[in-house]
Amino acid sequence: MALPACAVREFEPPRQPERGAPVRTTCPRRHSRVEAELAASRPGSVAASVRAGPPRGVSHGFHTRPLLDKPRKASSSLAGAACAPLFALLSRGRRRRMHVLRRRWDLGSLCRALLTRGLAALGHSLKHVLGAIFSKIFGPMASVGNMDEKSNKLLLALVMLFLFAVIVLQYVCPGTECQLLRLQAFSSPVPDPYRSEDESSARFVPRYNFTRGDLLRKVDFDIKGDDLIVFLHIQKTGGTTFGRHLVRNIQLEQPCECRVGQKKCTCHRPGKRETWLFSRFSTGWSCGLHADWTELTSCVPSVVDGKRDARLRPSRNFHYITILRDPVSRYLSEWRHVQRGATWKASLHVCDGRPPTSEELPSCYTGDDWSGCPLKEFMDCPYNLANNRQVRMLSDLTLVGCYNLSVMPEKQRNKVLLESAKSNLKHMAFFGLTEFQRKTQYLFEKTFNMNFISPFTQYNTTRASSVEINEEIQKRIEGLNFLDMELYSYAKDLFLQRYQFMRQKEHQEARRKRQEQRKFLKGRLLQTHFQSQGQGQSQNPNQNQSQNPNPNANQNLTQNLMQNLTQSLSQKENRESPKQNSGKEQNDNTSNGTNDYIGSVEKWR
């Protein structure tokens, strides 16, 4: 049943009454309430909107109702706030029609109508503005109608010009592949983020001879398989910062889940519930606090596959990584850490299946901790594990009888420990240096083919750098850590040679790709040119012969075109290639480049 006409008119814009006719504002009472309820039961009708009525808190008077009522939902509130400024652009009659939509409480239809009318009003206003601008340009006496016509012609001309440019570009180079090649060939080179690192290490002179296998570190790490990265964390080497990078700053298909308030993150393989990282921030101290190389190599396999049968254990690849630091800075940083109350009592020091006895590893303090310890007392303790800590944690302690100092003479023991630490460090999948954060990031990315999200930051100010020591104390610290000093010198030389070798290999690969790209582009341009020339000659051979008496003209034009293209590409290549090895020329072949690098090391020596 339809709603009475008087009820429908109540929600329509008020009409001007005829002269002399009375204005009816209310419905007659002859319509029963049952009829109104039946009319309101039909969905989507105006009666349903009438029955629903306006929202809560809104008056029933039309002329006293605001333009937009405050809706109850946040999304509707945002829509209303976005549509409210458009009411000012509408005429009075259109505003009244908008109120009909508002009474139905259909914000979607209201916003669509407002946007449509608003854009039309803005276009009309812009049209008049352009007309006013043209009137100022072409003469003050021009009429508004003529200016509107000129503005329309200008817009039409701009659109036609754009379409003409698109057609010409498509005709000159119809393939998208050709367009991409031209954009890559003539675009400005992408800045190299490691250019400053190359310049800083330009004066580096190698001291050790390493083979190509020692310098080339590229691990085929299968994160979806069974491979595992094991992080050997040495105290006060920046391992905490690097460990956070591993769980929070790597681009992965399935990133690690790190929750607020939890010390460990969940680093699962894609599609599995197994971890690919064995570190403090992923598995915790599963092998003891700051476990060394001797502990990790015997503990990690049993921890990872301890619950499985030996016959069902997969053949895993354990990729060990670590971070080293300058021995003097690391020693001072550890002293400051101990001075604040650190003890590392939870360290197990398990070697050959057992922890050391109190006679083998005495303590330097008698209380609960060593807080407030002065530097002299810290250096005077002969059992301080801070002395030569990096060599001890990277070597195989079973070769020297673990912590039993009576197995062999001290001099022989030190030599065995140092050689073992060098060998383990060289055969590790990766190691970085705290003093070279950006190079550490680069080598890790190239080694494991995993990219970090944000670059590493080099901090020049640390707690150790704030400690002022004289030359005598510094020499004593170097004497207490003489094994670490030699190991760090070896590690720094190997680290910088690896960086230079990987950078040189990367530049050679980029140069080879540019040469292949240039050859492909030359062939494509020549093919397009000769095809167009052949089509023109086949269509009108007599006219082409009369217009082109010299057949070598097209060939000279093609040669000039290719010469200019080659020159521009060569200039771009020269801008991109960095200055390496004191400006010495390098070969394009990868194997030849490797031999050149090894040969340059011999010349530097």
From Swiss-Prot:
GO terms for molecular function: heparan sulfate 6-sulfotransferase activity. Its main location: membrane. It is found in: Membrane. Glycans are attached at residues 209, 404, 460, 544, 556, 564, 589, 592. It catalyses: alpha-D-glucosaminyl-[heparan sulfate](n) + 3'-phosphoadenylyl sulfate = 6-sulfo-alpha-D-glucosaminyl-[heparan sulfate](n) + adenosine 3',5'-bisphosphate + H(+). Residues 28-605 are lumenal. Disulfide bonds: none annotated. Keywords: Disease variant, Glycoprotein, Intellectual disability, Membrane, Signal-anchor, Transferase, Transmembrane, Transmembrane helix. 3'-phosphoadenylyl sulfate binds at residues 233-241, 325, 333, 457-459, 463-464. Its EC number is 2.8.2.-. Residues 579-597 have a biased composition (Polar residues). It holds the Pfam family Sulfotransfer_2. Residues 1-66, 530-605 are annotated as: Disordered. Residues 1-4 are cytoplasmic. Residues 531-571 have a biased composition (Low complexity). It is a single-pass type II membrane protein. The active site is at residue 290. It is an enzyme of class 2 (transferase). The chain crosses the membrane at residues 5-27. GO terms for biological process: heparan sulfate proteoglycan biosynthetic process. Belongs to the sulfotransferase 6 family. 6-O-sulfation enzyme which catalyzes the transfer of sulfate from 3'-phosphoadenosine 5'-phosphosulfate (PAPS) to position 6 of the N-sulfoglucosamine residue (GlcNS) of heparan sulfate. It is linked to Paganini-Miozzo syndrome: An X-linked, syndromic, neurodevelopmental disorder characterized by intellectual disability, global developmental delay, severe myopia, and mild facial dysmorphism. This is Heparan-sulfate 6-O-sulfotransferase 2.
